[in-house]
Each structure stands twice: as structure tokens, then as C-alpha cells.
Design a protein with these regions (language model features):
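N-terminal module-boundary/linker segments of secreted carbohydrate-active enzymes
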Residues: 14-79, 247-256
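Residue-identity detector for glycine
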Residues: 11, 21, 34, 52, ...
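A generic structural signal for short, solvent-exposed coil/turn residues
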Residues: 9, 65-66, 92, 233
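A broad, low-specificity signal for short, low-complexity segments enriched in glycine/proline
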Residues: 31-34, 80-89, 201
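Catalytic cores of extracellular degradative/oxidative enzymes
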Residues: 73-87, 107-112
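Domain-level detector of nuclease and nuclease-like folds
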Residues: 90-99, 103-256
Length: 256
């Protein structure tokens, strides 16, 4: 793929080309694809530091995902009030049923410095976080869903309204609400790129095709870009898969 072709979005899906053309995004290393591109991105977008798990969660709740004193969980849009200047954001969040979800689970490689990498951490309703556990992400048939989650509610029956706003779970898989599927995909791509030596490769590959599809159907939006910027203020790095909408297709997706 040539530089001129990439800059014209050749071989890139129409949705991603439009998104890239109308945003603050850029094309990272436009002459590279595949393993070489992954290697360069891993080197150039590694965090300068991670904050430690306690401080990291405090920053997550009070600064990164706090918008005018409101903190929302990724999977259900459940929200709580939390003063961004609080000296105890972890305690306050926990008391109101919010804890930290590792998109790439701790048991699959999010340990050591990676445990507190904010690009892999999101607020979540505690029960929903627990129900997801370390299951891979997947498209779940409605008839196979065991429980549905939205806001502070859990139900066993198929929703009759706003079905796309629900996250779903089975014993072996988890599907986030549709508006966050792309966010989840790009967090997984980030983690597997930056921490490939410790990330469980079988776990990644078991969901790779689904994540590639979600990256297309739920493209990067302004809120995701702003979140990446906020994290960079504390870790010194952006999520490159948010910075560049072509990156997934040039690394893990079109090369499958």
C-alpha cells in the first residue's frame, strides 16, 4: 500500500475514510502495514509511565471519565455523581456501585505496569463487571443471552425497547452495548499491541474477527478522541487506534 494510496484512503472502508477525513485524526506511519507497523506503534505509543492501580483509578474516576461531576459506566451508561476534586474518588465510586473494568482482563495479561494503564481501564457497574469476568467479547444471539444490562437494571428477558442500549452476557461471552463496541475493540487492539509479550494471544485471536467488525460499525467519535487526550496528560501516550482510524485495518483486520 503506497503513501499516495493511503492518503487517499485507498483500501480503507468508506466509514473509516469519512471519519478520518472529518476529524482531528492522522495516519500513523502510512508506508507501513502488518508486523512492521505493529512493532513501530508498540515502540512509539508505549506509555511514559503508568500511575499505579490506586492512583490510576482515582484519575480515571475524577479526571478521565468524569464530565461535569458525572461518572458513567462503559457497559450500561449507569451514572453517579462524583466531584472531580474529591480526595476519595475510589471510595465514593465504589459506594455507588462503580469499579474499574479491565477491557483486556488481568487474568489474560493485564498485570504489572499494564494493570493500571488507563487506556485499558473503564468505569463499570460492579455487578456487570463481575458478570463479564474474563470472557471474550462476541456477538451474542438474542435467544442465547442469559442477562441484559442497562443503566442500573438487569433482566433475563429480551428487551422490547432500546435493545441496542443493553449489554449482554452468556456463560462464555460478553457483548457491550452497540455504542461502545468500537471503543472496546480499540482498547483491545491497544493492549495487545503495547503488551504483546504478556497478553494471552489465544484470548485475542478468539475475538479478533468480531473486534475488527466492531471497529468498522462503531467508528471513533469525538468523545473517544477527547478521552485519549485526557489519558495522555497523565501517561504521556495516546491510544494509536483512536488517533488513526486506518490502523486496525492495516494491522489486525484486513491482513487476517
Amino acid at each position: 500500500m503506497t503513501l499516495s494510496c493511503l492518503l487517499a484512503f485507498c483500501g480503507v472502508s468508506p466509514m473509516i475514510a469519512e471519519n478520518l477525513g472529518n476529524s482531528q485524526q492522522k495516519v500513523i506511519q502510512p508506508d507501513l502495514v502488518g508486523a512492521k507497523l505493529i512493532e513501530v506503534v508498540a515502540r512509539e505509543y508505549a506509555p511514559d509511565q503508568t500511575l499505579g492501580y490506586r492512583k490510576g483509578r482515582d484519575i480515571l474516576y475524577s479526571k478521565v471519565d468524569n464530565h461535569d461531576g458525572i461518572l458513567k459506566g462503559i457497559y450500561t451508561d449507569y451514572s453517579i455523581e462524583l466531584d472531580p476534586n474529591s480526595t476519595e474518588p475510589r471510595r465514593i465510586a465504589y459506594q455507588q456501585d462503580i469499579n474499574a473494568e479491565h477491557i483486556y482482563p488481568q487474568s489474560k495479561g493485564a498485570t504489572g505496569l499494564a494493570k493500571s494503564d488507563l487506556h485499558n481501564l473503564y468505569p463499570s457497574r460492579i455487578y456487570v463487571n463481575s458478570r463479564r469476568g474474563n470472557s471474550p467479547f462476541a456477538e451474542i444471539e438474542d435467544s442465547q443471552t442469559e442477562d441484559w444490562f442497562r443503566l442500573d437494571q438487569t433482566q433475563e428477558t429480551i428487551p422490547t425497547t432500546a435493545i441496542n442500549e443493553y449489554s449482554e452476557v452468556t456463560k462464555t461471552a460478553f457483548e457491550p452495548r452497540e455504542s461502545k463496541e468500537g471503543d472496546v475493540a480499540r482498547a483491545v487492539f491497544y493492549f495487545y499491541t503495547i503488551y504483546k509479550r504478556q497478553a494471552d494471544a489465544r484470548f485475542f485471536k478468539s475475538q479478533q474477527e468480531t473486534l475488527c467488525q466492531w471497529n468498522l460499525t462503531d467508528p471513533v467519535d469525538a468523545g473517544e478522541i477527547e478521552r485519549s487526550h485526557r489519558i495522555a496528560e497523565y501517561q504521556g501516550n495516546e491510544n494509536p487506534f483512536v488517533v488513526d482510524s486506518t490502523l486496525a485495518e492495516r494491522t489486525y483486520c484486513f491482513l487476517q
